[in-house]
């Protein structure tokens, strides 16, 4: 489709759409894990905070999404779909919902890519966070365990709604207009759960009260063993290292001016899940979020829930491979300001050496490994970055001189000058003239006493006296009654005399009225 976008805007838009598609898959899959997700807010956004949301990516899901995209982007005629299905321990399966990210031909030529499209995609992603938790599949995912698990599948192409059965419902999450088309995010979900109602998914208690394997329980005791979520085929070597988080977002390290850089990444260590074979299915589940692969469906991720007894593995990288230790770069005191990362790490990642004598303890090594990256639309001074390595959205508006937070007047405002009140000065002058010893005034603290609605002539008044005095204020002069004024009876008595005077001078009054006309 021919558009009037320049090369930079087109590059920006493609990047926004790509990362929006990846974040969409993350939000949908994480909403079907069966666990509540609690994310703490942060005042210092990192490079992974795309669209102003702190969504922690699961590496396996990102890898699966990128493999499904295969370098493509959702466009007119090409839709990205995420299918959520349910599979029981007996082998029965049922599709629950299908999320579709597509684009139509309706264009908005006047919209700005840099700000407007980015902010609207952020709102659409927030709407998706809410909608994924109101469909029936969310309630089923919270109850998954030994009896059934929730699967997901990502595919690119025509939407397949035949598996949802009759009478399925559709909901449109939202739309965002772009210069190349309108992005639409919608969901079709099953409402007929007759397959579920005919079964009693009740967890039978064990015969003995002893748990032999307290780490993992197989969700499919009668089916084939589950493969770990490491995306290896049968012919691949068991020592294949899974790509790290920063490698999964390599597009962030390009010369893109309006997107945040890569995630809060490790410039030395890469995430390496344990390489487990088919025969070790019992230990295959605690991988990032306790997931496994179905042998018959290698692209479907098994997500056992909390009732299945599957623990969640700590979300930390695995240390200890010799290849990673060989890539550790050393920094001399002369060039300890910035140390370039090794080729295996992200291109724009820089570390700061914290060792003053060239020797680094294990704690210092960990400090030099992780670097905080500037996130989307963040213009906060950071010690670890320079103008040459700064890669933030709209970098042209960034300040030319990056100041440290210690000298930043917005972070540490200067102390206000101390002002001495006249009352305090007079008290100090009286004390100094009274004697040279000063022992009399050492036991007192001089304060500047300024009572509310007070004047200088009533400064000795305390708060109680002030309150009592103004509790009964004097009456207003406009409401005061003149004692010498005539009463109503006297006014009525003098009325005939006033009328007689008026009748006598009626001509003068008439002439005066005529002059007024």
From Swiss-Prot:
GO cellular component term, pick one: endoplasmic reticulum membrane
Naturally occurring in which organism (per UniProt): Homo sapiens
Function: Autophagy factor required for autophagosome formation and mitophagy. Target of the TOR kinase signaling pathway that regulates autophagy through the control of the phosphorylation status of ATG13 and ULK1, and the regulation of the ATG13-ULK1-RB1CC1 complex. Through its regulation of ULK1 activity, plays a role in the regulation of the kinase activity of mTORC1 and cell proliferation.
Family: Belongs to the ATG13 family. Metazoan subfamily.
Domain of life: Eukaryota
Lineage of the organism: Eukaryota, Metazoa, Chordata, Craniata, Vertebrata
Gene: ATG13
Entry comment, domain topic: The LIR motif (LC3-interacting region) is required for the interaction with the ATG8 family proteins GABARAP, GABARAPL, GABARAPL2, and MAP1LC3A.
Descriptive protein name: Autophagy-related protein 13
Residues with the Phosphoserine modification: 355-356, 361
Post-translational modification: Phosphorylated by ULK1, ULK2 and mTOR. Phosphorylation status depends on nutrient-rich conditions; dephosphorylated during starvation or following treatment with rapamycin. ULK1-mediated phosphorylation of ATG13 at Ser-355 is required for efficient clearance of depolarized mitochondria.
One Gene Ontology term from the biological process aspect of the record: positive regulation of autophagy
């Amino acid at each position: 489709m021919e558009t009037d976008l320049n090369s930079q805007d087109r590059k920006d838009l493609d990047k926004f759409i790509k990362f929006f598609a990846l974040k969409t898959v993350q939000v949908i899959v994480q909403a079907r894990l069966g666990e509540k997700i609690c994310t703490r807010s942060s005042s210092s956004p990192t490079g992974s905070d795309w669209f102003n949301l702190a969504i922690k990516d699961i590496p396996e899901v990102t890898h699966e999404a990128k493999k499904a995209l295969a370098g493509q982007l959702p466009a007119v005629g090409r839709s990205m779909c995420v299918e959520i299905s349910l599979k029981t321990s007996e082998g029965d399966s049922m599709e629950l919902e299908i999320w579709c990210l597509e684009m139509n031909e309706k264009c908005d030529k006047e919209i700005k890519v840099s700000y407007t499209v980015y902010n609207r995609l952020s709102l659409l992603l927030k709407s998706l966070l809410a909608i994924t938790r109101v469909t029936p599949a969310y309630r089923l995912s919270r109850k998954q365990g030994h009896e059934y698990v929730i699967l997901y599948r990502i595919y690119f192409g025509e939407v397949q709604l035949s598996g949802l059965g009759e009478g399925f419902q559709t909901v449109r999450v939202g739309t965002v207009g772009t210069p190349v088309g309108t992005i639409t995010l919608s969901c079709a979900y099953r409402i007929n759960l007759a397959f579920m109602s005919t079964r009693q998914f009740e967890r039978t208690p064990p015969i003995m009260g002893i748990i032999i394997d307290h780490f993992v329980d197989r969700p499919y005791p009668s089916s084939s063993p589950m493969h770990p979520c490491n995306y290896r085929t049968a012919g691949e070597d068991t020592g294949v290292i899974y790509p790290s988080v920063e490698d999964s977002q390599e597009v962030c390290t390009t010369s893109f001016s309006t997107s945040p850089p890569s995630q809060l990444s490790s410039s030395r260590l890469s995430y390496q899940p344990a390489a487990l074979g088919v025969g070790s299915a019992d230990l295959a589940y605690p991988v990032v979020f306790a997931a496994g692969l179905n042998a018959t469906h290698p692209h479907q991720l098994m997500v056992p829930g909390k009732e299945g007894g599957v623990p969640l593995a700590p979300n930390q990288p695995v240390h200890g491979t010799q290849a990673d230790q060989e890539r550790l770069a050393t920094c001399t005191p002369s060039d300890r300001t910035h140390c370039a990362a090794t080729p295996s790490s992200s291109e724009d990642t820089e570390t700061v050496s914290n060792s003053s004598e060239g020797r680094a303890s294990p704690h210092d090594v960990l400090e030099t490994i992780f670097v905080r990256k500037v996130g989307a639309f963040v213009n906060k001074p950071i010690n670890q970055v320079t103008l040459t390595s700064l890669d933030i959205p709209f970098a042209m508006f960034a300040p030319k001189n990056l100041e440290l937070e210690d000298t930043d007047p917005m972070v540490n405002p200067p102390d206000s000058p101390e002002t001495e009140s006249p009352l305090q000065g007079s008290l100090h002058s009286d004390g100094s003239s009274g004697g040279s010893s000063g022992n009399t005034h050492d036991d007192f603290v001089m304060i500047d006493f300024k009572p509310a609605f007070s004047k200088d002539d009533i400064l000795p008044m305390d708060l109680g006296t002030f309150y009592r005095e103004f509790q009964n204020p004097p009456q207003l002069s406009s409401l005061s009654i003149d004692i010498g004024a005539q009463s109503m009876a006297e006014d009525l008595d003098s009325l005939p005399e006033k009328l007689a005077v008026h009748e006598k001078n009626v001509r003068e009054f008439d002439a005066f009225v005529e002059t007024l006309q």
